[in-house]
UniProtKB/Swiss-Prot annotation:
<dbReference type="GO" id="GO:0007416">
    <property type="term" value="P:synapse assembly"/>
</dbReference>
<feature type="region of interest" description="Disordered">
    <location>
        <begin position="281"/>
        <end position="302"/>
    </location>
</feature>
<dbReference type="InterPro" id="IPR006594">
    <property type="entry name" value="LisH"/>
</dbReference>
<protein>
    <recommendedName>
        <fullName>Single-stranded DNA-binding protein homolog sam-10</fullName>
    </recommendedName>
</protein>
<dbReference type="GO" id="GO:0010629">
    <property type="term" value="P:negative regulation of gene expression"/>
</dbReference>
<keyword id="KW-0963">Cytoplasm</keyword>
<feature type="domain" description="LisH">
    <location>
        <begin position="19"/>
        <end position="51"/>
    </location>
</feature>
<dbReference type="GO" id="GO:0005634">
    <property type="term" value="C:nucleus"/>
</dbReference>
<feature type="region of interest" description="Disordered">
    <location>
        <begin position="357"/>
        <end position="442"/>
    </location>
</feature>
<keyword id="KW-0524">Neurogenesis</keyword>
<dbReference type="GO" id="GO:1902473">
    <property type="term" value="P:regulation of protein localization to synapse"/>
</dbReference>
<dbReference type="GO" id="GO:0005737">
    <property type="term" value="C:cytoplasm"/>
</dbReference>
<feature type="compositionally biased region" description="Low complexity">
    <location>
        <begin position="288"/>
        <end position="298"/>
    </location>
</feature>
<feature type="region of interest" description="Disordered">
    <location>
        <begin position="217"/>
        <end position="249"/>
    </location>
</feature>
<feature type="compositionally biased region" description="Low complexity">
    <location>
        <begin position="321"/>
        <end position="336"/>
    </location>
</feature>
<feature type="compositionally biased region" description="Polar residues">
    <location>
        <begin position="396"/>
        <end position="406"/>
    </location>
</feature>
<feature type="compositionally biased region" description="Low complexity">
    <location>
        <begin position="407"/>
        <end position="421"/>
    </location>
</feature>
Length: 455
């Protein structure tokens, strides 16, 4: 057992023995002063003779005091006991006005003002069976509302104090309320919780779990508003602005210095133009230019108009393969785009290989035209702008070669509805997927789609 515990137990026993001796002497004193001399002598022979310390204390108290100490404290206790609200309302014994005022003042005392009603020192036992268990003035279960144990523990936390119904009937403003902590101070009971630190942790919750807002202010800043907050742009829980939702229309360009969210790798840069929701951003940004689009065709818009990087194919449409349309050199309607698409190609010995055809972009007003593909490469189909049923350059005219320099060419037309056709008959014995029969079926499907667009 630790030495401190042993010392406390010894002090408790010594204090209890002293209290018993004093009580015995005060009883003998009370009997002497009230005229019960025979009873006092009998009490002395039976009790004080076995306890010399109590007899000595009784002799000293009788000589030094002309009044009974026990009687004085009993009168004080009984006055306060009778003035308690639950007893005075029931019409009990009379009490003084001072005792009534004492109870009213103790009820209205704010929490934390212990005064001399604080709990006794550690180690002193409470006489739970005695009416004046608490400090010799209050009945069992009665404790001033302001009397609190060290550390702010309410009286109900001690098993020796049963719950007081009067304290339960107290108004909310009279209860032991805890004021809110000042700014920057820790919350009560929040000690020991994880405290993540690092860049992007704006709020100092002092022990409470914090959320890392990307792009937030440095530590010490206020909480970030959520989307819809008036007077501010708002912040989403992941730190992105409302117009920067991933893969959604009108997606903005994220800042270059934005840290990754939850350890995820940064997303590749995308263009500021809108794209369908949920569509990947594998393509490079396209340069938009002013051009007239054919009716029903999905095109990239002019300046200020969001251009479509890709479109969702409609029912019955043919999947897109490696194809592109290239405008004339210096034409502002040309679109620079670089696609890497594997394409099947037949060599002279009949073996099938995969060749990646890289079509370099052509910008408006810069550089030379794209060189024609090799003779063995499959040519792409070009659709030239115009109106339905127009001359060469209309949506119904199809060229089997790249047509640079044509004034009526419209490279902004939708390539999804124009599958590529073979530039010529395949060599004998080849297993080309685009044979004559397949070309005929594809032509029928293409004509049906074009008729549906132009209808």
């Amino acid at each position: 057992m630790p030495p401190q515990v042993i010392q406390q137990q010894q002090q408790s026993l010594a204090s209890e023995m002293t209290a018993r001796d004093r009580l015995t002497s005060y009883i003998y004193e009370y009997l002497q002063q009230t005229g019960a001399s025979k009873t006092a002598e009998t009490f002395k022979e039976e009790v004080l003779s076995t306890n010399p310390a109590a007899g000595l204390a009784a002799a000293n108290s009788t000589k030094l005091s002309d009044k009974s100490f026990l009687l004085e404290w009993w009168l004080l206790f009984w006055d306060l006991y009778s003035a308690a609200p639950e007893r005075r309302d029931a019409g009990g014994d009379p009490f003084s006005a001072e005792a009534k005022y004492f109870h009213e003042a103790m009820i209205g005392m704010p929490p934390g003002m212990n005064g001399h009603f604080a709990p006794p020192p550690m180690g002193m036992e409470m006489m739970g069976g005695h009416p004046g268990a608490f400090g010799g003035r209050f009945a069992p279960g009665r404790m001033p509302p302001g009397a609190m144990a060290p550390g702010g523990m309410p009286p109900g936390a001690f098993p020796m104090f049963p719950p007081d119904p009067r304290l339960q009937r107290m108004a909310p403003n009279q209860g032991m309320r805890m004021p809110p902590p000042p700014v920057g101070q820790p919350f009560p009971g929040a000690v020991g919780m994880p405290r993540p630190v690092g860049p992007g942790a704006p709020m100092d919750m002092s022990g409470m779990q914090r959320f890392d807002f990307m792009g937030g202010p440095p530590p010490g800043g206020g909480a970030q508003p959520f989307p819809g907050a008036s007077g501010s742009g708002g912040m989403m829980p992941n730190g992105a602005h409302p117009h920067m939702s991933l893969n959604s229309p009108s997606m903005g360009v994220p800042p270059a210095d934005m840290p990754p969210f939850m350890g995820m790798p940064p997303m590749p840069p995308t263009s500021s133009s809108a794209m369908p929701f949920g569509m990947s951003s594998d393509h490079q940004p396209m340069s938009a230019g002013p051009a007239a689009a054919a009716p029903g065709a999905t095109t990239a818009g002019g300046p200020g108009t969001p251009g479509m990087i890709g479109s969702v194919p409609g029912p019955g449409s043919v999947p897109q393969v490696a194809t592109t349309s290239v405008g004339s050199v210096g034409t502002p309607s040309s679109i620079g785009q670089q696609l890497h698409q594997p394409k099947q190609e037949i060599t002279t010995n009949g073996e099938e290989i995969m060749k990646t055809e890289a079509l370099t972009p052509t910008g408006g007003g810069g550089g030379g035209s794209v060189p024609p593909p090799p003779p063995a490469a499959t040519a792409a189909v070009s659709m030239n702008g115009g109106g339905p049923g127009s001359a060469p350059g209309s949506a119904h005219s199809v060229n089997n070669n790249v047509n640079p320099g044509t004034p009526g060419s419209n490279p902004l037309s939708n390539p999804m509805s124009n599958p590529p056709l073979s530039s010529g008959p395949p060599p004998p014995g080849s297993n080309d997927a685009f044979g004559k029969d397949d070309n005929g079926e594809i032509s029928k499907i293409r004509e049906g789609l074009l008729d549906g667009f132009c209808a």
